[in-house]
Amino acid sequence: MSQQFKYVVRIFGQDVDGTMKLPYALAMVKGIGYNTAKAIIRKLGMDPNARLGELSDAEVKKVESVISDHTIKGLPSWLYNRRKDYESGLDLHLVTSDLIFYVRNDIEREKKSRSWRGVRHSLGLKVRGQRTRTTGRTGMTIGVARKKAAQPQSQQSSSQQQKSS
């Protein structure tokens, strides 16, 4: 353990609070969830109750190097976030900008192939079979406020008609 406690630690180009416990701190990185973080910490033999700021620079580099290889040896394949990659066929675990890039490419590939999912993406509709009759609406809403605003005007016009007769 390092003598100096760091309140802000930079992991994968992201500033993370050093007072957080290791699994929660690693879960702040895009592409790493709590369960994956726990598995990585267990694989490295670190204490899951330790704070991120207590780690030395070498230990932080060790965590980064294990995750940046895209395959974490010794972890089950169902824990990876990209199984059977389209181009390579390998099980990968992607983080940060790599994950964003691959997901964007997947969506563009589906749009080009004009698959059902690609068509839904291109139309800006829900993709995974959700109902769309009432939820997921976008744009301007014509709500109750217009109806209420119309009611006083109709009452005024009816009162004017009564006065004129």
From Swiss-Prot:
<feature type="compositionally biased region" description="Low complexity">
    <location>
        <begin position="153"/>
        <end position="165"/>
    </location>
</feature>
<dbReference type="GO" id="GO:0006412">
    <property type="term" value="P:translation"/>
</dbReference>
<dbReference type="GO" id="GO:0003735">
    <property type="term" value="F:structural constituent of ribosome"/>
</dbReference>
<keyword id="KW-0694">RNA-binding</keyword>
<comment type="subunit">
    <text>Part of the 30S ribosomal subunit. Forms a loose heterodimer with protein S19. Forms two bridges to the 50S subunit in the 70S ribosome.</text>
</comment>
<dbReference type="GO" id="GO:0015935">
    <property type="term" value="C:small ribosomal subunit"/>
</dbReference>
<feature type="region of interest" description="Disordered">
    <location>
        <begin position="139"/>
        <end position="165"/>
    </location>
</feature>
<comment type="function">
    <text>Located at the top of the head of the 30S subunit, it contacts several helices of the 16S rRNA. In the 70S ribosome it contacts the 23S rRNA (bridge B1a) and protein L5 of the 50S subunit (bridge B1b), connecting the 2 subunits; these bridges are implicated in subunit movement.</text>
</comment>
<comment type="similarity">
    <text>Belongs to the universal ribosomal protein uS13 family.</text>
</comment>
<dbReference type="GO" id="GO:0005829">
    <property type="term" value="C:cytosol"/>
</dbReference>
<protein>
    <recommendedName>
        <fullName>Small ribosomal subunit protein uS13</fullName>
    </recommendedName>
</protein>
<dbReference type="InterPro" id="IPR001892">
    <property type="entry name" value="Ribosomal_uS13"/>
</dbReference>
<dbReference type="InterPro" id="IPR019977">
    <property type="entry name" value="Ribosomal_uS13_archaeal"/>
</dbReference>
<keyword id="KW-0699">rRNA-binding</keyword>
<keyword id="KW-0687">Ribonucleoprotein</keyword>
<dbReference type="GO" id="GO:0019843">
    <property type="term" value="F:rRNA binding"/>
</dbReference>
<dbReference type="InterPro" id="IPR010979">
    <property type="entry name" value="Ribosomal_uS13-like_H2TH"/>
</dbReference>
<dbReference type="InterPro" id="IPR018269">
    <property type="entry name" value="Ribosomal_uS13_CS"/>
</dbReference>
<dbReference type="InterPro" id="IPR027437">
    <property type="entry name" value="Rbsml_uS13_C"/>
</dbReference>
<keyword id="KW-0689">Ribosomal protein</keyword>
<dbReference type="Pfam" id="PF00416">
    <property type="entry name" value="Ribosomal_S13"/>
</dbReference>
